[in-house]
Regions:
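C-terminal, beta-strand-rich globular interaction domains
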Residues: 277, 286-378
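Soluble regions of membrane-associated proteins that transit the secretory/organelle pathway
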Residues: 3-6
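Long, hydrophobic alpha/beta structural blocks
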Residues: 14-17, 21-324
Length: 378
């Protein structure tokens, strides 16, 4: 799915734009026991409660592609005949109305999910979307539809204990101490099937993880029985390892600055283009950056081999997963230097009297803990 398709579905999660009739779910305690079930009609829920349910489910379609939103791809064999795909199709085709199917799905989540000692809420809903056609100007015609996109959305929300506070009890006309439990934003969730080319793709699902470095592979294994792509944090670490292992001493400050600047430029240009498809970087593209910086062909070949080992043959990466385009940071054991990414060139490395130094020009005013200071010898 691309950004436009995700955004199109996100807009469904408003009171006046969806065909959601019921919200299903269950509340699970830290001992993996179901405490209570949810089976609520959207038509009779107070509007503020209905909107809160919709907002929680909509979060499952938020974040960045390839970071928070990850494509789950089923094999042809799984789609043809597998328990995991059959269950997901049954959830969708029954519109979640079959309680036994819902229970089987809940148990898959409960038996696999690791949220520590947290209680949590599993939410499920089904929607049918009359997909409007687009005219010659790529504008949607709300009155024309050729297909209905039937899909389910699931999210898992931690339920957190609220600290004890004083509260007013109208029945007693008094204040008493009170506590409660609050449903937090979803930790994970998914959409099935995927909405590719504005149509159902039963070979894919879209998985959501709030944390980009912890995508809950245990749930992906249980529900989808497949291996998810590397998380953003894993991609970054693997890319850094491939560079440092292959380049050795050639992996210096100037080279890393150049790589950061080139990737940042690609990210900025992609944003300006408003291209809904995720930005991709091939290993050949990364190798070309090294070549432009004078890296020896032998080391470039070693880098390509390392990438093949880390990511697999023919892998494509998202530059936004490899660098933080909003800053340029240099760390030593005792200090951290952070500069605006457009000024990364200001940071230099020097060896003076046998010691390594980081140098930054100080042509403008200098502040230390908010105090303006001067340089000795000015």
């Amino acid at each position: 799915m691309n950004l436009k398709e995700v955004s199109e579905l996100r807009r469904r999660f408003r009171m006046d734009r969806n065909a959601i009739s019921r919200i299903y779910g269950c509340f699970v305690n830290s001992s993996r026991e179901i405490v209570s079930y949810i089976d609520e009609s959207m038509g009779i829920l107070p509007q503020d409660e209905a909107e809160k349910y919709l907002n929680l489910l909509k979060k499952t379609l938020s974040g960045k592609l390839w970071k928070n939103l990850i494509d789950i791809i089923f094999s042809t064999e799984q789609v043809a005949d597998s328990d995991e795909h059959r269950l997901l199709m049954a959830l969708r085709d029954s519109q979640l109305k079959d309680g036994d199917i819902r229970e089987e799905f809940y148990q898959k989540i409960i038996n696999s999910l690791d949220l520590g000692d947290s209680n949590y809420l599993i939410l499920l809903t089904h929607d049918s979307y009359d997909v409007p056609r687009k005219n010659k100007n790529d504008e949607m015609d709300a009155d024309a539809s050729d297909a209905v996109f039937s899909y389910v959305v699931c999210c898992v929300c931690p339920v957190k204990e609220r600290k004890v506070e004083l509260g007013f009890f109208p029945g007693d006309n008094e204040f008493h101490s009170c506590a409660g439990q609050i449903v937090a934003a979803p930790e994970l969730g998914f959409l099935f099937p995927a909405f590719d080319d504005r149509a159902a793709n039963i070979y894919n699902a879209l998985f959501y993880s709030r944390k980009t470095d912890e995508i809950h592979q245990e749930v992906i294994d249980s529900v989808f029985h497949t291996t998810a792509p590397m998380s953003a944090a894993e991609q970054k670490e693997a890319f850094q390892n491939a560079l440092s292992e292959a380049l050795g001493d050639a992996c210096n400050m100037e080279l890393v600055q150049s790589i950061h600047d080139r990737l940042r430029d690609q990210i900025e240009q992609h944003k300006e283009s408003h291209d809904p498809e995720p930005l991709e970087l091939s290993v050949s593209d990364a190798a070309a950056i090294l070549r432009d910086n004078g890296v020896e062909e032998e080391k470039i070949l070693a880098f390509r081999d390392s990438c093949a080992t880390q990511f697999g043959d023919g892998a494509t990466l998202n530059p936004a997963n490899l660098i933080d385009s909003s800053r340029f940071e240099v760390k030593t054991a005792d200090a951290t230097i952070s500069v605006g990414p457009e000024h990364s060139y200001l940071v230099e490395t020097r060896i003076i009297d046998g010691r390594k130094y980081l140098l930054i020009p100080a042509d403008e005013d200098i502040e230390v803990n908010g105090f303006g200071v001067r340089v000795k010898g000015e």
